Regions:
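Bacterial Sec-dependent N-terminal signal peptides
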Residues: 1-23
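Phosphate-group recognition and catalysis centered on beta-loop-alpha active-site segments
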Residues: 20-260
Length: 260
């Protein structure tokens, strides 16, 4: 088990170290469900990460930013799980028929961990060919953010479910395997708002955080980051793995014309 874990970490570190090119796979669709075409706009732009907020209400999982915005037709299954299933069938078990690439679905739990996470895993288990990498190597990666269980409870959930990490949290080796990503609030580390250069001291602090996360074979994104071209350039310079955006076409076009 230890050898297998070490091999996985080495492989991920190697991938991170060699992935110098930024593409749309480095793009994250923030609050994707608020787009005019939830899921499809980011998917068609070949985004590597898509975010959905969920609420558990009366045994169903609804997608919304606020509870007051819940509507009967906007369930996780209708907006994301079923469309993904249709595409995987069309593409013979892959996200995109002409590519081996896949993406992650970052699911933000807005209601309490339980029963929300159990309801979610029950729904995901209906689609093992979509989300379980032991069944399909091209599976969509599920990462849980928002309300999360204590790391000691990670093991209580299916192995295909990963969790958003926090740099202030300590994880043992078995828990770290279940950390699929680190997400941090950029405002906690810098007052920079995307227009001017980052102060050198704050840039060094960010680089240290990013390098530390990469050093354990994980990826990182910053939420609450300025959503501008100037900001995107700085985030690429810092080697942030996923660039947050609410502006899918603009970031997709930017990444095509500003590859590093």
């Amino acid at each position: 088990m230890q050898k297998k874990l070490l091999s996985i970490l080495v492989l991920i570190c190697t991938t991170l170290a060699t992935n110098a090119q930024y593409t749309s796979l480095n793009a994250h669709s923030h609050n994707d469900y608020e787009q005019k075409q939830p899921f499809y706009l980011a998917y068609n732009a070949h985004f590597g990460s898509i975010e959905a907020d969920i609420w558990a209400v009366d045994g169903e999982l609804y997608v919304a930013h606020n509870k007051s915005e819940i509507s009967a037709e906007r369930t996780l299954e209708m907006l994301y799980l079923k469309p993904i299933s249709v595409l995987y069938k069309q593409n013979k078990g892959k996200a995109w028929g002409d590519s081996p690439d896949t993406f992650q679905l970052l699911i933000d739990l807005k209601t309490a961990v339980e029963p929300t996470l159990t309801l979610l895993t029950e729904k995901l288990k209906k689609y093992p060919e979509l989300f379980d990498p032991s069944i399909n190597k091209n599976a969509v990666r599920i990462v849980i953010t928002g309300n999360r269980p204590n790391p000691s409870k990670f093991k209580d959930y299916p192995g295909f479910v990963f969790f958003d990490g926090n740099i202030s949290q300590k994880y043992d080796a078995s828990q770290l395997v279940r950390v699929g990503l680190y997400s941090e609030n950029l405002a906690n580390f810098t007052k920079w708002r995307g227009m001017e250069s980052i102060p050198e001291k704050e840039e060094l602090r960010l680089r240290h955080i990013i390098d530390s996360v990469h050093g354990i074979g994980k990826r990182i994104r910053f939420w609450n980051a300025p959503d501008t071209e100037a900001s995107w350039k700085i985030l690429m310079k810092l080697k942030v793995d996923f660039i947050n955006t609410d502006h899918i076409p603009e970031l997709a076009n930017f990444l095509k014309t500003n590859q590093q």
